[in-house]
A protein has these predicted regions:
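Catalytic helix-loop patch of NAD(P)-dependent Rossmann-fold dehydrogenases
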Residues: 115-151
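Conserved Rossmann-fold cofactor-binding substructure of NAD(P)-dependent oxidoreductases
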Residues: 43-64
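Substrate-positioning beta->alpha
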Residues: 157, 164-167, 176-198
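C-terminal amphipathic/interface module of NAD(P)-dependent oxidoreductases
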Residues: 240-277
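Mid/C-terminal beta-alpha module of Rossmann-like enzyme folds, strongest
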Residues: 191-243
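N-terminal Rossmann-fold NAD(P) dinucleotide-binding loop
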Residues: 14-15
Length: 277
């Protein structure tokens, strides 16, 4: 019998993880409040809400691995708490101790302001916003209750269909703070990282998911504007509650993951040239 993996929350990132798991020949279950009509037929969908424990009754009992990667469905603290703090508790109660690996997809929002310095998994956390505080609370609870759980703290995702930034640049509406360092990872590399950590023997408790090229926002936006043949972005304030930092991916790469898109500008260029954004 094929090993079974549950994707708890299965949006754009989850679907890309699912494709990799299916290619391994695994049995893939995906939990979502409203399963999509267009998705790989081999995915076994579960219509449920992580914030509603009653909806999780009857989950399959033979799940071997879990990737927890939902979208919050809103930018308010109550929804974040329901999905990221309460959700793992509900899911663990529903599944029991059977899964031998959990990967919790978190965010670099758990870090505070670092003045553009390099950070890694051992850098102290000091989240500035409610999202980072609640994600950190969820990480700590999960690792206290599942000592083998693995946390993946992702940088900002970009990739096909994620065109908001490029659209703002085209329209001359983007603003960039000089000297404010930002980090990116292609969504396909993020999916590869989740798949990798689901199967990595003896993983460490935490990994940062970012590419090799953190850049100040004004330099990144300026380079993207040139690729788009758009006007350079005007100066603007730093993003609210997003500290300036450079994320080190050394631990993730040392574990054996090879990034397809280590340079975000090369990744953006490919998307623009292929008309995918």
């Amino acid at each position: 019998m094929a090993q079974a993996v549950l994707l708890a929350g299965c949006g754009d990132l989850g679907l890309r993880v699912a494709e990799r798991l299916l290619a391994r020949g695994l049995e893939v279950w995906a939990l979502r409040r409203h399963p999509p009509s267009a998705a790989p037929a081999a995915i076994r969908w579960i219509a449920a809400d992580l914030a509603d424990p009653a909806s999780l009754a009857g989950l399959p009992r033979h799940i071997d691995r879990v990737a927890y990667l939902p979208a919050p469905g809103g930018r308010d603290p109550d929804r974040y708490r329901a999905v990221f703090v309460d959700g793992p508790r509900h899911l663990l109660a529903a599944l029991g101790p059977q899964p031998r690996r959990w990967v919790f997809v978190s965010s670099s929002a758990v870090y505070g302001e670092h003045g553009g310095q390099w950070i890694d998994e051992d850098t102290p956390t000091a989240p500035q916003g409610f999202n980072g505080r609640l994600l950190l609370q969820a990480e700590q609870w999960l690792q206290a209750n599942l000592p083998g759980a693995v946390v993946l703290r992702l940088a900002g995702l970009y990739g096909p269909g994620r065109s908001q930034l490029l659209q703002r640049l085209r329209e001359g509406q983007a603003r960039a703070a000089a000297g404010h360092w930002a980090n990116r990872i292609h969504i396909d590399d993020a999916a590869a990282a989740v798949d990798h950590l689901l199967h990595l023997p003896a993983p460490l408790p935490c990994y940062l998911g970012a590419d090799d090229t953190p850049m100040p926002l004004d330099q990144l936006y300026g380079a993207l504007a040139r690729l788009l043949q758009a006007p350079p972005p005007a100066p603007g304030p730093a993003p609210a509650q997003v500290g300036s930092k450079r994320m080190s991916n050394r631990r993730l790469k040392a574990s054996g993951l090879a990034l397809r898109w280590p340079d975000s500008l090369a990744g953006y260029r490919d998307l623009i040239e292929r008309g995918m954004v």
